[in-house]
């Protein structure tokens, strides 16, 4: 099985890249986000690989990190999610945002993925909530906020600040992560306006 490829970018197509490794061109399917991040043809690149072997074909899927590859595998444990949908999800949400969306059960963030409807998005955030392994880069503050929001225990300034950032167009995972960081910086007695201001600074980094 192929676990990693390191070579030169030969060419791109809509959903895959040809990676030249020692004169052999490997067709590697990638998410849109990964393809956009890869260098120009002729430059070097390294991809973590997931190899699918079937009776009639061998298919390679490429990722910028082992963490992204693990998410690709985990997503496919959800009913109705195959390789194509898993790649699409990772093309819409980078691993950290996906982890936060699952922690917050933010199915709307997942449903922004082309080809993912509300039912599949609901299954992803529900079935993976307790499966997200140690590699998931979830902000601890987001995890605490998730429980507080679900139980209606979140302090009103924090809840209002998250709502304000969402109204400004930010996704719930982004807003929650930013306000979690703002709350750590400002302390427990911070007011809504201060949290919003600090949250916007976090989002601008």
UniProtKB/Swiss-Prot annotation:
Residues 1-64 are annotated as: Domain I. The keyword Iron-sulfur does not apply. GO terms for biological process: DNA recombination; DNA repair. It holds the Pfam family RuvA_N. SMART domains: HhH1 (SM00278). Residues 65-143 are annotated as: Domain II. It comes from the Bacteria. It is found in: Cytoplasm. Residues 154-205 are annotated as: Domain III. SUPFAM superfamilies: DNA helicase RuvA subunit, C-terminal domain, Nucleic acid-binding proteins, RuvA domain 2-like. Residues 144-154 are annotated as: Flexible linker. Keywords: Cytoplasm, DNA damage, DNA recombination, DNA repair, DNA-binding. One of its GO terms (cellular component) is cytoplasm. Gene3D superfamilies: 5' to 3' exonuclease, C-terminal subdomain, DNA helicase RuvA subunit, C-terminal domain, Nucleic acid-binding proteins. One of its GO terms (molecular function) is four-way junction DNA binding. HAMAP family: DNA_HJ_migration_RuvA. Belongs to the RuvA family. The RuvA-RuvB-RuvC complex processes Holliday junction (HJ) DNA during genetic recombination and DNA repair, while the RuvA-RuvB complex plays an important role in the rescue of blocked DNA replication forks via replication fork reversal (RFR). RuvA specifically binds to HJ cruciform DNA, conferring on it an open structure. The RuvB hexamer acts as an ATP-dependent pump, pulling dsDNA into and through the RuvAB complex. HJ branch migration allows RuvC to scan DNA until it finds its consensus sequence, where it cleaves and resolves the cruciform DNA. Homotetramer. Forms an RuvA(8)-RuvB(12)-Holliday junction (HJ) complex. HJ DNA is sandwiched between 2 RuvA tetramers; dsDNA enters through RuvA and exits via RuvB. An RuvB hexamer assembles on each DNA strand where it exits the tetramer. Each RuvB hexamer is contacted by two RuvA subunits (via domain III) on 2 adjacent RuvB subunits; this complex drives branch migration. In the full resolvosome a probable DNA-RuvA(4)-RuvB(12)-RuvC(2) complex forms which resolves the HJ. Has three domains with a flexible linker between the domains II and III and assumes an 'L' shape. Domain III is highly mobile and contacts RuvB. This is Holliday junction branch migration complex subunit RuvA. It comes from Bradyrhizobium sp. (strain BTAi1 / ATCC BAA-1182). The gene is ruvA.
């Amino acid at each position: 099985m192929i676990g990693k490829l390191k070579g030169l970018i030969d060419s791109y197509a809509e959903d895959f890249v040809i990676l030249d490794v020692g004169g052999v061109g490997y067709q590697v399917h990638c998410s849109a986000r990964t393809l956009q991040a890869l260098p120009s043809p002729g430059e070097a690149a390294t991809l973590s690989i997931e190899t699918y072997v079937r009776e009639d074909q061998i298919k390679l899927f490429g990722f910028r990190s082992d963490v992204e590859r693990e998410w690709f595998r985990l997503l496919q444990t959800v009913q109705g999610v195959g390789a194509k949908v898993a790649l699409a999800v990772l093309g819409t949400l980078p691993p950290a945002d996906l982890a936060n969306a699952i922690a917050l059960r933010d199915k709307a963030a997942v449903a922004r993925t082309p080809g993912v409807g509300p039912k599949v998005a609901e299954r992803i955030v529900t079935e993976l909530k307790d499966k997200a392994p140690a590699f998931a880069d979830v902000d601890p503050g987001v995890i605490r906020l998730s429980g507080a929001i679900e139980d209606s225990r979140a302090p009103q300034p924090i809840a209002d600040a998250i709502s304000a950032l969402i109204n400004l167009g930010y996704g719930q995972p982004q807003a929650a992560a930013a306000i979690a960081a703002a709350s750590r910086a400002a302390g427990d007695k911070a007011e809504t306006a201060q949290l919003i201001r600090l949250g916007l600074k976090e989002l601008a980094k």
